[in-house]
Amino acid sequence: MAAIPRDAATLILMRDVAQARTGIEILLVRRHAKSAFMPGAYVFPGGAVETADYTRQAEIICHGLSFEQARDIISGTSPPEKALGFFVAAIRETFEEAGIILAYRETPNVIAFSEDEKVRFTKYRRQVRKDAFSFATIIEREGLKLATENLFYFAHWITPEVSPIRFDARFFVSVAPSKQEVLCDASETTDHVWISPQK
């Protein structure tokens, strides 16, 4: 019997690169060799949607996207509020796996980390992984709003039935913040590469 797929979100981050033939590169992170799902593979950042990703608290920390607006983009989720959860999960998982966070202190510019903030947010990542803090609590504590309106819904894919671990994944595309750098956590991810879509 096929495994039931879990709801998940994936974020394809792009950056402008003048010397690239296509003009853009996309981010891939390498999954840890001991990961249960696709060990050692280069993938887009992403993971399972959690209940906390579509609570009222989650809606409050989103900029430019409400439960209703998310449902207009992604219909048919159960419960309906889960539509927003896909957006939040894409940002949260990218933060956990790549250290990049699409969020504002003051719009319209996505935050840039100072050296002190890099250290602080690295600690936050460890605390989120250990369930010491929720992602939403960190966002509120830092006075941030998630840049959910900068995520463009791109595709919906379900892992084939032959896989013992399956995901019902929504894919999003966004521009990578120019003043943040990828920091793999050595737990979920061990390396990264920016690569031309042609490859």
Language-model-derived ranges and their functions:
Residues 1-199:
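N-terminal leader/linker segments that precede catalytic domains of diphosphate-processing enzymes
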